[in-house]
Amino acid sequence: MNLRMVKSGLVLAFLAIAQWVPAQQAPQMEALPIDPNVRYGVLDNGLTYYVRHNETPKNRAEFHIAQKVGSILENEDQRGLAHFLEHMAFNGTEHFPGKTMLNYLENNGIKFGVDLNAYTGFDETVYRISNVPTQNQNLVDSCLLVLYDWACAISLNDKDIDEERGVIHEEWRTRADADWRTWEATVPVMFEGSQYANRMPIGTMEVVMNFPYQALRDYYHKWYRPDQQGIIVIGDFDADKMEAQIKELFGKIKMPENAAERIYYNVPDNKEPIFAFHKDKEAAYTRVDIYMKHDPMPREMRGTINGAITDYMNGVVGIMFNNRITEITQKPDAPFIAGAIFDGDFFVSKTKSAFTLIAVGKDNGAIDAIKGIMREAERIDRYGFTASEYDRARATMLSNYENLYKERNNRKNVDYAEEYIRHFIDGGYIPGIEMEYNLIKQMSPAITVDMVNQYVKSLISEDNMVISLTGPDKEGVTYPDKAQVLAAIKEVEAEEVAPYVDKVSNEPLISKEPVAGKVTKSVAGKKFGTTEWTLSNGAKVVLKPTDFKSDEITMLAVSKGGYSLYNTSDPTLALDLKSLNEVVELGGLGQFGKTDLMKVLAGKQVSSSFSLSEAQESVFASCATKDLETMMQLVYLTFTDLHRDDEAFAAWKEQSKAALVNYANTPQYIFSDSLSATLYNHNPLRRQMKAEDIDQISYDRILQIAKERTANAADYTFIFVGSFNTDSLKPYVEKYIASLPANKNREKVGKLIETQKGIINNNYNQPMETAKSTVYAIYSGDQKYDLRNYLMLSILDQVMDIVYTETIREEEGGTYGVGTMADFSPVDNSWLFLFGFDTNPQDEKRLTDRAHAELMKVVNEGPREKDFAKVKEYMLKKHAQNQRENSYWREIIRSNELGYGDNDTNYEETLNSITIDDMKAFSKKLFTGKDLIEVIMTGVEKAE
C-alpha cells in the first residue's frame, strides 16, 4: 500500500471523525488483506476458524474457542448463567465425562488454571488450552475434540450443576469488595435504558443458587452455536492437516433452525449529562471517570485503512495526553494523584465508544480532580498538541512497531491467538506485522499534528457525557452533587487556560564522558555457554548471547548485601529502606528529571532501574539492539548520578499519604498488616506502610543508601543476555562499566529477617460490608537448599494445589480456590509453605481443619501417583519451554554468580529420579508440627 492510498484513506478517516458517516454514504474502501500466513475461513454452518503454523515456542500449540456470547444475552431470570456455563465446561462433556478432561490434560503437562482456563464477559466467552505439546498427535487431536465438546457437547448433569453452585457463590464472595460494589451501584446508572445496566457476568446469587437445570441447558443450546463461534489454533504443527481436521470435525455441528437473533444491545445517547455516584466504607480512593460518548467505528470500516489510521491517531493521542498527565503528577499540589486518558469502548459496552478521562483524587478533592483532568482536556481542545510532542509520540509509535517487526519470527503462539480472538469478536484487521509496519511508516509522515489535533478535538464534547464519582464513605469526607460537578466543569471552560509549553533539552545524556577502562581477562564460562570478562576496575561481566529474540538485550547487575546490611529493626530506617525503590525512580538520571528524561528517550526502547531487596542490590536494564549505547549510558548514570528532584519527592509524599489514608482501613490492608506482623514478629521492615509514616521518610537518607549500594562496581557481576554480538558490546562495556568507581571491598549477606517460630494463632473479627473469612496457614523451617530439595518442595506445592481444588473447592464447594505457595531460600536455607483461601465465615473452621488434614495426609502418605505424575510432567514441559527464555537464563546465571548454585544443570535427571517415597521422607522431615502460623480474619457484617 503506497502513500497515495494512505492519504486517500485519511479522507475517510476524517469523515469518520465526524461521528462516522453512514456506510451507504461513505466512499467504499477495500478491507486490508488477511495475513497470508493465517488459514482463515468460515464453514458452511457459520463457524469461523483461524489456523497458523508458528514455532515460538517450539513443539507447542494454543487451542482457543471464542464465543460472541456473554452475560448481555441473559434474561432477567438467567442472570449468571453465561458465567455458570463457562464453569460447567470443565465438569464433563460428551467425550470427556466428569473430570476425565482435566485428568487427561494434566497428565500431559497442561495445568488447570495456568494452561487451561476460560473467562466470561458481557459480550464474549473464551476458553483456552495453552502450551500443548505437539509431539503427541493423540494429544493434539484430543484438544480439538475438547474444543468441539465445548462448542456443542457440554454434559450439564444435574449433580454437577448443584456442586458448582457453591463454588460460584464463593467466587462472588471473594470478589465482593468495594470495587465490585461500586460497579454494581454505578453501572445501572451509567447504562440506564440499556441491557448493560443489569448484566454483570457473576449474576445474582438468587439465580445462581436456584435456577432450574433446564434453564442452563436451554441457554447453552440457544447461544452456543457455529455462527457465534471462532476456533483459533496456533502452533508448531502441519497447518494443512490442522485446517482439514477443523473443517471435518467442526463442519459436523448443525446450525439450529430458526436460531435466535444475536442482538447487539445499544446504549442510548443522552443530551443531559448522566451522573453516577457511590461511596463505600471500604473504598480506598476517590475517583472520577468522565466519558464523552460517541458512536464506534462501524465494523465494516474497522478492517480498512480507516481502522488502521484511527488506531494510529488514538495511539499518539494517548501517548501525548498521558505524558502531560505524568508531568502534572510530578509536581506538588497536583489536582489529582493519578490520571489517564484514552478513547475506546464505553466502559463495558461494544456498541458505544467514549473518550474517557480518569482522575484519582484526595479525600475531599473530588472537585479539584474533576477540574484538573477537564482542564487538560480543555487545553487540548483550545490549543491542541505541539509539534515537538507529536514528533516524540510518532517516534515512540514507530519504535514500537519496529521492535514488533524485528521480532516477527519470535512472536509467541499466545500473542497470535489473542490477536485473532479480538479480530473475531471485535472485527478489525490482521494483515501481519510486515504490512502494519509499512503502513505505520507511511502514515506517520502523512498525518500531521494539525490532523491529530482536529481528530482529538472532535472527541472532546459535553454532549453525551457520563460522569461517575466514587470514593470512601467516612466521617469528614464530603462529595459534590451533580449540579456542583457540572458547575465545576463550566468553571474550567470559563478559565484562561494557557497553552502547554513543551520544554525540551538538547543536552547529552552524560555531561562528562567517562574515561574508558579495559577488559583485562576473557574466559569461557564453565557452564551455560557463557563468556566471562574481568574488567580493569575489578567488575565481572558474564555474557550469554542468544537467538531467542531478535531485538532484545537485557542486563542485570547484582551484588550481595541488600537490606541485610542495615539495621532493619530501626523503625525510621526501615521506612527509608522499604520506600527506596519507589523514591529513587522519582528523580530521573544525571541532569535530567524524570519528565525531561522521558522526553529525551522518546522513540527508544530502553530502560534502567536500581532496586534493593533483602539480600542483594541490583540494576536491571533492557533495550532494543539499536539503543544499546543509550542503555549503557543509563546504566552508568544509575550507578553514578541519580538525579535529585525535591518537587517530585514532595508530590510523591502527598500522593502516597492520600492513597494510604483510606487503603489502611480496608479489610485487605488490615489482613496483610496482620499477616506480616504475625509472620515476622512485628519487624518494622515487614509491616505495612501507613499514611502517618510518609513524613518520616528521608530523601537524603534514601539517596545516600542508593549511592552506598552502587559505589563499588567491583562487587557486582554484570550479566548480559540477549541478541548482541560480543565484539560489538565490548567497547560499550569498557566505556560505561569498566569506568565505574570501584574498590577491593567485597560484601556478604547479613542477617535476614526470620519468620516466627512455634505455634502461633492470630484470629480476629473484622467488620465488613460483605462478610467473608480469609484464612492463611504458614508452615516454616530450615532445610539444606539444593536442587533436589528445591524440586521436592515445588512438587509438594503443586500437588497440594491439585488436592485442594479437588477437595476444598469441588467436594466442599466452600471456596473459589485455595492458593498455595512454597518458598525456599538458598541464602539462609529457610523454607515456608502456605495455603490461603476465602470462605463463608460459617465454614471457616471446617475448611481450615480439612485443609490442614489434606496437607498432612500427603506429608505422611506421599502424593497420589496420578498427582505426582501430573506435576512432574508439567515441570518437565515448563523447563523445556524455559530453555528459550532470556529471563530464565538471566535468573539462572544470577543465582550461580551469587554462589547459590543453579537450578538448570541436571534438572531433568534430578526431577525424574525423585520418587513418592522420596517425597514422603522429605515432607516428614519438613513438617514436624513445631512451626505453624495461622492468621484468620473472620468477617462480620457491619452494623448499619
Predicted regions located by residue number:
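Bacterial N-terminal signal peptides that target proteins for export
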Residues: 1-10
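Proteolytic maturation boundary segments
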Residues: 23-51, 238-303, 307-322, 326, ...
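Hydrophobic, small-residue-rich alpha-helical packing segments that form membrane-like cores
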Residues: 160-228, 232-246, 255-264, 268-282
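M16 family metallopeptidases and their MPP-like homologs
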Residues: 50-52, 57-74, 81-82, 99-149, ...
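Non-catalytic, conformational "gating/processing" segments within enzyme and secreted inhibitor domains
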Residues: 153, 158, 165, 179, ...
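Active-site His/Glu-centered metal-binding helix of metallohydrolases
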Residues: 81-89, 317, 580
